[in-house]
A protein has these predicted regions:
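N-terminal small/glycine-rich loop or linker at the start of catalytic domains
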Residues: 1-21, 115-118, 157-172, 264-274, ...
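N-terminal beta1-alpha1-beta2 module of alpha/beta enzyme domains
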Residues: 1-77, 173, 343-345, 354-360, ...
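Conserved, mostly hydrophobic/aromatic
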Residues: 3, 41, 49, 67, ...
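Hydrophobic faces of well-ordered beta-strands that scaffold small-molecule active sites
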Residues: 3-7, 45-47, 76-78, 106-110, ...
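Active-site mouth loops of central-metabolism enzymes
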Residues: 13-27, 81-89, 172-182, 274-282
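Internal, glycine-rich beta/alpha segment that forms the wall or movable "lid"
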Residues: 16, 87-195, 207-210, 214, ...
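Glycine-rich, proline-tolerant flexible connector loops at the mouths of alpha/beta enzymes
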Residues: 44-67, 82, 114, 201-204, ...
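Aromatic-lined glycan-binding groove of carbohydrate-active enzymes
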Residues: 185-191, 209-217, 221-262
């Protein structure tokens, strides 16, 4: 099980102190959080992509490239890379470059995003969202899988004898997850290509994500990539903890009540009852997270949102220390012990490169001697 954190990169006023962090402070905080993720033994750090205030992560690969130089072990990923408005050529180049810089510690989550105005900012029409997703991903796959690409589509200029550089590290493209909150077509694309499917699992009841993940698993098996329970699934989650449950509730309440997404809506008690959010003790965080496997089946990656809603960096780092000491070892042990032997581990570059090498060796012609 790969366990880590993801950020939506919001810049939000701290409702307790009234202080608004600067862009620079939030960017440096992201680096500090990623380093803490590695320090406590987590496996993944992922950042979102936004091109409007109040967010800072307009250039995820730049941020992740810097973090790669500050870390040695963790996988560096995105919470969303906008497949609809980014040029597939630039995605292919940027993430292959990040692969080389990080020594293969790179994958990405592709998604459509949730900000409609971003489409015209990049010369696209939001009504073409799904068609852009399909066409752009087909081109991205060709750019990574083929040395020379000749291609013509609807939404960008044709390519003739084009080679994307640098080439993927060891001939293995970065692993792709497809992220979706509500779009069945995205689950279909992930299943068709045998890619991973990442369910945000933050703001909706479990029944909503059970439908999307169930569809993805069914179609993954339909396309012949393996049994439904072998499909590669990632989940989000969200927590705030203190050693004493009531202390966590009291401390987090003003942040919850004023959060840009769910603030001034349902009560914190209702929201924690209806969604994956856990506010309480480390044991409560552990117990609720373990229920995800019961609802969604065996899965490979669990990421948590912990740095949003104006929470100060000091508090976020304390959350990670608590998680690393009281939750992570037991969570990893329990989830790994539940996973059947035929269900794969989370994807890594090393495993995928080894599988490719074995496949090439197996298909090589045998020459007789003598």
């Amino acid at each position: 099980m790969q366990i880590g954190v993801f950020s939506v990169s919001d810049i939000t006023r701290d409702p307790v102190t009234g202080r608004m962090p600067t862009e620079g402070e939030r960017i440096k905080a992201a680096v500090a959080i990623a380093r803490k993720v590695e320090e406590i033994g987590m496996d993944v750090y992922a950042t979102g992509e936004h091109h409007n205030p109040p967010f800072y992560a307009s250039s995820p690969t730049t941020l992740l490239g810097y973090i790669a130089a500050q870390t040695e072990r963790i996988i560096l990923s995105t919470a969303t890379t906008l497949i609809t408005t980014n040029d597939p050529v630039k995605i292919a180049e940027d993430f292959a470059m990040l692969q080389h810089l990080s020594g293969g510690r790179t994958d990405l989550v592709l998604g459509r995003g949730n900000t409609a105005p971003v489409y015209p900012w990049f010369g696209k029409n939001p009504q073409d969202s799904v068609d852009l997703t399909v066409e752009n991903y087909n081109l991205l796959r060709q750019l990574w899988d083929n040395e020379t690409v000749n291609w013509q589509g609807k939404f960008r200029t044709p390519l003739q004898n084009f080679t994307s550089t640098p080439r993927p590290l060891d001939g293995v493209a970065p692993f792709v997850w497809h992220g979706s909150i509500r779009t069945p077509q995205v689950a279909e694309i992930a299943a068709y290509f045998g890619d991973g499917f990442f369910a945000n699992n933050i703001f909706w009841p479990k029944e909503h994500y059970m439908q999307l993940i169930g569809l993805y698993r069914e179609r993954y098996e339909h396309y012949g990539h393996g049994s439904a329970d072998q499909a590669i699934v990632g989940l989000g989650g969200q927590f705030f903890m203190r050693k004493n449950s009531q202390d966590a509730v009291n401390e987090f309440r003003p942040y919850f009540d004023n959060a840009p997404v769910y603030g001034h809506g349902p009560s914190m008690e209702d929201f924690t009852a209806q969604t994956p959010l856990t506010v309480g003790s480390p044991q409560e965080v552990l117990e609720k997270t373990l229920t995800f496997q019961e609802y969604f089946g065996d899965y490979q990656r669990q990421l948590f949102l912990i740095d949003h809603a104006g929470l100060p960096l000091k508090t976020v780092l304390e959350q990670l220390d608590l998680f690393g000491e009281y939750v992570l070892p037991e969570l990893r042990r329990e989830l790994d012990s539940r996973r059947p032997a035929h269900v794969p581990d989370g994807p890594t570059h090393a495993r995928r490169a080894a599988a490719r090498e074995a496949s090439v060796s197996a298909s090589a012609p045998v020459t007789s001697v003598g």
